[in-house]
Amino acid sequence: MQTKYQKVIKISLIFIIILGFNYGVSFQQFLHYDWADPRGLSDSSSYLAMSNGDYAISSGHRYRVIIPFLTSLVRDLVQPLVPPEQLHWFGGVDAFSFYIVNYLFTSLTGLFLYCFLAQLKFDPKLSLLGVFIFLGSRITILATGAPIVDSLYFLSIIIIVYFCLTQNTTTLAILTPILILSKETIIPFLFLPFFVKQINRKLFGVSLITSFVVFFWVRDTISSWSPNQMENNDPIFNVVVNHLKSGFENIIQTYFSMGGWHGIFSTFSIFWIAAAFGVWLSFKKLNTFYQIPNFLFFIIPITFGFTVLSSNVGRMLLSSFPIVIPYTLIGINYLFSTKSSDHSPLKNIRTLDAHENK
């Protein structure tokens, strides 16, 4: 019993640290977010309308219902408790309500990420560093401080990979019908459990089929609320086709423009280099302690596919955090290892090169 209490206390303390760090990096983004000039976050106006019960918007955003719905509940709780002048300082009740919901979701993402990294055998300090890298990303800060729905999307990703790693089919099966409603881009990640041998694929398959039934039922219901006859149909397939048509243009904009490079760099900044070093270490067998599960590698084509479908490369690339951050930690751990000089990174690299040149 004492061990269980110790684990609860430890996780609680870790979550408090995560809450504090997340507040520190995201609050200024929330406080100074300009609703009149969203600068690339134009979907925020749709979510604001939805949180106020207006789903008659001519946009594919209207089906991402969970965060706007929760925001409306938080608004009803906050409004009578906080004086209007204080709410005005927070940017108004709408902004404050969105921030509470998104702040909680990204903090929970950080907690699940910590547990995920611990399962991969990273020690508590490295695991917490991985959480800080995620929460400190410019894209995560935007997802927390701005009125958008990506926070639940990132939480859904880490929930899926965590329960795949722990081989918890039952929990995955229960949560999948909810996770599928977070954002349409979560759908490819819902197929990751099929690449884990220990997952009960029949049980999860039933859950996934049920999830798609729920997915299309919710979308059909929301479509029926629109007074515009043109908007009564679910545009999901048209949206995918239109994105595919602009795929080549998106590739040029993402990988061959200053704006695209900025979007790539802003996701993990200098930690991209550490991640590449971690990949190299694993490829050269210099890292044999940390083993990255094979199913995580399927995240790479999923994420790359998103950069083809969307010009917002930063928000798409952050989806790769469950595989980028572990490799980043492998690289950082190797560089800052406190082992003896005989096992120092540079010495090992020189030894390997000498061996290859023989």
Tell where the protein language model's regions lie, with residue ranges.
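Short helix- or helix-capping micro-motifs
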Residues: 127-136, 176-180
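Short hydrophobic/aromatic helix or loop-helix immediately within or flanking a transmembrane segment
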Residues: 57-92
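Transmembrane-helix motifs of polytopic, lipid-linked glycan transferases
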Residues: 92, 96-120
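Hydrophobic, aromatic-rich transmembrane alpha-helices
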Residues: 110-111, 265-291, 298-302, 327
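Membrane-embedded glycan-lipid processing machinery
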Residues: 59, 63, 97-104, 133, ...
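Transmembrane signal-anchor helices characteristic of membrane glycosylation enzymes that use polyprenol
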Residues: 6-41, 209-223, 299-303
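Membrane-interface alpha helices of multi-pass inner-membrane proteins
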Residues: 158-163, 170-183, 188-195, 212
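Specific aromatic-rich, kink-prone transmembrane helix
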Residues: 112-115, 133, 151-172, 323-327
